[in-house]
Amino acid sequence: MTAINFRNLAHHTIDISSPEVFFVGNNGQGKTNILEVLYLAAYGNSFRTRTESELYATHARSNEYRVKVMYRGEYTHTVQIFSKNGKKRIEKNLKKIRTKKELISSIPCILFFHNDLDFVVGTPERRRFFLDQSLSMCNPLYLEYLQKYHALTKTKNREIKEKRVQLLDALDTQIATVGFDLVQWRTQLVRDFNVIFTKYYERLGDLAQVRIEYKPSWSDSSVEEIVHSLYKRRKHDLAMGMSMSGPHRDKIHFTRSQALFIPQASTGQRRLVSLVLRMSQAVFYTGVTGKLPVLLMDDVLLELDPEKRERFMMSLPPYDQLFCTFLPGEAYRRYGREKTRVYFVSEGACHE
């Protein structure tokens, strides 16, 4: 991995070929920035910001950065990202990519991050994002349909705001056709996830029957029924100035014994839900693709008691590689294996 002018990272290349790579250092030294580079190479965007200029090193003479990650999985992939003045170019194996669909399967990263708690206590949009990400990782067609659905909904909302109803019939037919498949994929995902999620949560949290519940905005069982429902809801949409139903309004809850779980859950139980979601995502990805993911874990053990930390690390799903960040006082060596590589990070530089 090489980074040039990226946040506070020093300009050098580090060997990340070990099965486990640990980055140890105090806060603010650059540990998370390293994981950010790996995530950037996997998805084409940061998990911390949508503002490209925030990624430029403050000491750089120009507003640009370059990162390069070589990943040897089933095939060897080299991903390079060049960014200058807010414009980004991504190359995979020296060829420019035009859509994220071309990149997303190259380095199958799953990130455990403290902001994952948003999937549990945040807005419905954040929980939908988690479902979308889980499906997009292993189903390129889902990502294509999702992008098409959002484009159609955006067009429909524009027509609604302008009170132009002539195109709404045609738009609703397209939205129903694409949206129906999205709902089917999400329904099956949650069904598959629950087999994994419930088992892991019981193992780590000593609590049975914690489940994910998916509540689609549409209850219709065919495209034709959805088209009819959208027509009946049109007056309401026009009154509200936007489309009020569809996959962009779906809800996801966590339940236990058919009651909502999160309102009564402790802080630790909520954090564990976010961790088990990511574990389930990794297992699901492997089950669908037959490939092992790369796990990125950024200071996610801090809120767990020592016993649960140990149990969590021992229960990690199979992975191709594991990248973890730790504070110096944590028992990181206990989690290492024979070939684990440990880097100590200080002021953006790594040393062994």
Curated annotation (Swiss-Prot):
Q: Per UniProt, which keywords does this protein have? A: ATP-binding, Cytoplasm, DNA damage, DNA repair, DNA replication, DNA-binding, Nucleotide-binding, SOS response
Question: From which domain of life does this come?
Answer: Bacteria
Chief location category: cytoplasm
Q: Does the keyword Mitochondrion apply?
A: no
> Looking at the Swiss-Prot or TrEMBL record, what is one Pfam family this protein matches?
SMC_N
The record's GO molecular-function terms, alphabetically, read: ATP binding; single-stranded DNA binding
Q: Which InterPro entries match?
A: DNA-binding_RecF, DNA-binding_RecF_CS, P-loop_NTPase, RecF/RecN/SMC_N, RecF_2
Location in the cell reads: Cytoplasm
Binding locations of ATP: G25, N26, N27, G28, Q29, G30, K31, T32
Q: Name one GO biological process term.
A: double-strand break repair
Which Gene Ontology cellular component terms are annotated?
cytoplasm
Q: Which family does the record claim for this protein?
A: Belongs to the RecF family.
Described by its record, this protein's role is as follows: The RecF protein is involved in DNA metabolism; it is required for DNA replication and normal SOS inducibility. RecF binds preferentially to single-stranded, linear DNA. It also seems to bind ATP.
Q: What is this protein called?
A: DNA replication and repair protein RecF
Q: Which organism is it from?
A: Treponema pallidum (strain Nichols)
In the UniProt record, what gene is named as encoding this protein? recF
